[in-house]
Amino acid sequence: MEELRTYLNQYFKINESEWNLLQAIIQNQKFDTKQLLVQSGQVSKYIYFIRSGLLRVFHLNKGKEISTYFACDGQFISTFESLITQKPSTEYLETIEATEVYAISYKKLIDLYEQNPKFEKIGRMLAEQNYLCIKNRTYNFQTQTAKERYLEFINTYHQKIIQRVPQKQLASYLGIEAESLSRIRGQFLIT
């Protein structure tokens, strides 16, 4: 669990007693490729810190999968709207490859916030980062061409995700067809 501790210590120094509180509520879980952790209509019960692997959040629009978020090693992921509201999700959370996570249940997370204000600050910081990510994505969709969105994705997610995400899923994230993505990639000789 040192990856998680290192991640958290970037923002707030976690002492031993705080770390012990957090460790007590973490579940280590492993999932196979293409396994759904949350389905549309289901209430999201966990937030996940990814130890290794790759996941995506997506929704269905007229039967077509639209990817809205990718996360890999060293990042948090959930279907956040459902997690926060504790109402049924409109999204799916799926592994793209075999994945190991540290899972924290929503109920235990709220209890932890009440026990220790430092964890509530961490939660607020993560929520703020999530909001900024969504805001930037919305702005990019409104102001950038498909090529510009692709370049933004490369600059934001780096090679550690781009080489692992199937082209069809990446294309849906960018709001384009897979064939268009193939042409754009060809212009930059990135495969």
Summary of predicted features, one role per range:
Residues 34, 45-56, 73-74:
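Glycine- and acidic-residue-biased ligand/ion/polar-headgroup-sensing regions
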